[in-house]
Amino acid sequence: MAGHLVKYGKHRTRRSYARIKEVLDLPNLIEIQSDSYQWFLDEGLREMFNDIMPIEDFAGKLSLEFVDYQLLEPKYTVDEAREHEANYSAPLHVTLRLTNHETGEIKSQDVFFGDFPLMTEQGTFIINGAERVIVSQLVRSPGVYYNLDTDKNNRKIWGTTVIPNRGAWLEYETDAKEISYVRIDRTRKIPMTELVRALGFGSDEEIIDIFGGSDSLDFTLDKDVHKNPEDSRVAESLKDIYERLRPGEPKTADSSRSLLTARFFDPKRYDMAPVGRYKVNKKLSLKTRLLGQTLAETLADPDTGEVIAQKGEMVNKDVMKKLAVFLDRPDFKMVTYQPSEEAVVTEPMTIQVIKVQDPNDPERTLNMIGNGNIDAKLKHITPADIIASMNYFFLLQDGIGSTDDIDHLGNRRIRSVGELLQNQFRIGLSRMERVVRERMSIQDAETVTPQQLINIRPVVAATKEFFGSSQLSQFMDQTNPLGELSHKRRLSALGPGGLTRDRAGYEVRDVHYTHYGRMCPIETPEGPNIGLINNLASYGKINRYGFIETPYRRVSWEDHKVTDRIDYLTADEEDQFVIAQANSPLNDDGSFADDVVMARHESDNIETSIENVDYMDVSPKQVVAVATACIPFLENDDSNRALMGANMQRQAVPLVDPHSPLIGTGIEYKAAHDSGVALLCQHAGVVEYVDAREVRVRRDDGALDTYKLMKFRRSNGGKNYNQRPIVRVNDKVDADEVLADGPSMEQGELALGQNPLIAFMTWQGYNFEDAIAINERLVRDDVYTSIHIEEYESEARDTKLGPEEMTREIPNIGEDALRNLDQDGIVRVGAEVEDGDILVGKVTPKGVTELSAEERLLHAIFGEKAREVRDTSLRVPHGGGGIVQDVKIFTRENGDELSPGVNMMVRVYIAQKRKLQVGDKMAGRHGNKGTVSVVIPQEDMPYMPDGTPIDIMLSPMGVPSRMNIGQVLELHLGMAARNLGIHMTTPVFDGAQDKDIWEAVAEAGMDSDAKSVLYDGRTGEPFEQRVAVGVMHYMKLAHMVDDKIHARSIGPYSLVTQQPLGGKAQFGGQRFGEMEVWALEAYGAAYTLQEILTYKSDDVVGRVKTYEAIVKGEPIPRPGVPESFRVLVKELQALGLDMKVLGGDDQEVELRDMDEEDDDVVNVDALSKYAEKQNEKTNASAEEAKAPSTESAPVETKNNQN
């Protein structure tokens, strides 16, 4: 028997078919969120305050310094914040020190900086009572990038971009004549040498001395001539640059100097961030650039004079090993140049210069310039960086160096929560800085305190805006635990500072070889966001620079054995190594079993000797994300279908009694454990008490821990989040063990669906085109039943005419409709309600005249309802019926915070139990989705020889063209597992082989083809062919027909066109569009067409009269003019076109406005005005009083129109 037993948690043992031993456990799956936020609290905040502070006033008298900060206790707990629709946040207090330089007086003070949102243990934020996730952003890393294009004549165009984190871009480019230009901040281009001159190297000789020979440089110097003899070359260049940056302004050398200093050399305006400095130093360092080049000078040890490398020697890895030590020294081959006094930066510039041979012409020597090991703490760019980057640009044209691939993950980095928050907070602080400066100059320096200078509004506004409305702050997907986990691990290339959907081409979206082990090549949305939204691979981590790292096992260079040492490599580090696959066969001592192995190097898959191998993958599943790693037999599925499978697992609805898959992949336990919905034990101990609401654990040190379970809570997606204990009294529990299953969990494992008996067969054409025929048992036994909870809210406000009132006494409502309401008009918990039932009775005062003193007295004594009120009760919307699960009442008296003008708020939760029905969407894990087309009685279902009826019938046509064969393998192995009564694990890329499956089939006593004879439930006859029958994990998805079905007779209309609104959410109608009109015209259905275009749509008067006629039983009147036609006429009139409507006799037809009255044409407003006039006319005759009896009709249609 193949396979071995593996225990997942304490409650589930599976037979695993994995062959590769796990050398590294999966990391905590939400650490991308929690670690980043922790960094922000520990370092990020402090770093930002230190950046902005000290703030000095314009005269330099006062300065405000940052001392320290602390977060106090949060005002609400997580649950209270949810309940009160508040933020889960803590007050931030900052200690500031104000120094008066004239008197030497120092004042320290603690200043409140607003409430700062805290991250929950699950990696989410609670903002206004809703759980939100800050998605990590994938952006282009700051650094220097080189690229090569061709123009229309196939000539090479070289380009360079120096990208900072904040500040002006610097771009170099060549034209068809090989002249090099520079652009500053996307302005017009100027010859590159002008920028060099502005840096203080004015003469051509100096420039040639620095850069050495280069064709492009010579052409550029020829182009850049001295135009104005009155100015020195440096001053002239400064003025030229100023003219490009500020066209039309008077140009002087001084203003240009200060402008360039501000653009590039002021740390407040230009920030490379540590990652930018790291990338620039790495790209321009001679350590990487000298490899593979031939030296044009002899290099010696500056101390001893010993030769390190001879002239004419090629620098290979061995030479570089000796050289590297010296290249890091501050005195090795360093050259210092003194810029002119007029330059932008007048400090001496030190660069590292080594002469190398031109690869195309060995006689010619080239200068290779490094930026001289600039300190990693330096945030802005330096003249040495600019000179070295230009030198790289020139050498690139001579064939030395390499261009950069912008989609390489060494050039894209992750901005996680902490950094995004920091950037947002910085914006708030810099706005505050301006205010502080102004206040410093206004207020009296003697008496002012830090508190008086600080205005925290901009800081609070910036964080509020970020959490509330940033594209990266998203309402958490809480359909099931896997959806939550995936959302927290999502990487988006969209958002502020990122890409936009329309501008992103194919290259950005495509899978890149550096995604291996870093980003999942499978899990990404279908549609316009494909490839822009990705997921972190299962073992991926993010380093301090924001690059994604993935772990590899080190292969010893001496004896070529795989060691236990694990190294995390970024994409550009990995490019230097050869990496063997995780499934390369190994001997027991760690040596490779074969002399030649499959390996990866850069973008190639190669067969190579084991002497060349540097590393080995840690696990086959390190390539994919968590959701993808949940698909068994992933290796047998087409990638497009696997993508759908991974995405649809996130949409599985939590069922009432879920079961974890019989055929798992071994990641189910870890995914459920880290998702945040399971109840985890904090400290080891023994369980003392268990019930449905709490678990108590006696710790080993004697203390008692009480854990409250989450019961029937509404999740973000309206699903039911509920926890069930899985431990018993006297169980010994360890720290971090699962005490209670959350939604979609069973025995501590992820359980997104059920394991029904499935046959691939057709049945009466009911499973045509991905339709699914199901057994009535699945409905009757609540196999796929789920609970959905919806929340409804009603507020009693103060209006101009008096306060609204929650009450049971609602005008014109019978006692029957009030049977479930208490004395305050609020529905009781447990009541069964249907569409249209009242949940909260509420009345709003109507406009009435002031009561006389007598009426007021009567009202006070008898409490008569003398006042006119309107019924504004909260009712159950269409399709919202169910059982009232909970009612929460918030009032000011109870100390609840309500928004201004609100006196009382009632929140009602209604739970629905939804059984599986025709129209619901279901899916397996291999992208095999369909909708339920028929529910067949159990006795009519095909049954197996032992009498077991099939649960689900799928169309066999759904397999071959889709190429997701994984479902067939799962089916067979699942049947074997069911017969053997065990659970199995078949990890991705390392699972059961076909021989393992056939062995399991034989062991389970099944037929050798793994098929079965099936009998027709209606006739008892066997079917002609044997049928593949087995067990597959099958899920019900969140796309349920109950949420989609919709009907309308009368309802709301659009204000301008008076046509019905569209969509279920607006209770809209079906649009009868242009093509549908053609269809009716083709059939000559004139009256149907007329009704559709008038009464049923926007003939305002006709609607009302038709309704009236139906109520009174009179013949339906002729239609009037559709309102949209009038809108069209008005629009044409607005263009100055006189538009008239002519009747059949060429006489003009009068188009009345909606609100004009007429005896024939009656609209709702006219009807109510008419009724009022009748009351006023006391001397009116009886006939007039009886006119159009409009009591019942207008009320309803009036509501419909508003």
UniProtKB/Swiss-Prot annotation:
Any Pfam family: RNA_pol_Rpb2_2
Biased composition (Acidic residues): 1151-1162
Recorded GO CC terms: DNA-directed RNA polymerase complex
Enzyme Commission no: 2.7.7.6
Sequence ranges of Polar residues compositional bias: 1189-1202
Catalytic activity: RNA(n) + a ribonucleoside 5'-triphosphate = RNA(n+1) + diphosphate
Keywords, in A-Z order: DNA-directed RNA polymerase, Nucleotidyltransferase, Transcription, Transferase
MF terms in GO: DNA binding; DNA-directed RNA polymerase activity; ribonucleoside binding
Taxonomic superkingdom: Bacteria
Region called Disordered, residue ranges: 1151-1202
SUPFAM superfamilies: beta and beta-prime subunits of DNA dependent RNA-polymerase
UniProt record, GO biological process: DNA-templated transcription
Disulfide bonds: none
Subunit structure, as described in the record: The RNAP catalytic core consists of 2 alpha, 1 beta, 1 beta' and 1 omega subunit. When a sigma factor is associated with the core the holoenzyme is formed, which can initiate transcription.
Job description of the protein: DNA-dependent RNA polymerase catalyzes the transcription of DNA into RNA using the four ribonucleoside triphosphates as substrates.
Family: Belongs to the RNA polymerase beta chain family.
Protein name: DNA-directed RNA polymerase subunit beta
Organism, as annotated: Pediococcus pentosaceus (strain ATCC 25745 / CCUG 21536 / LMG 10740 / 183-1w)
Annotated gene: rpoB
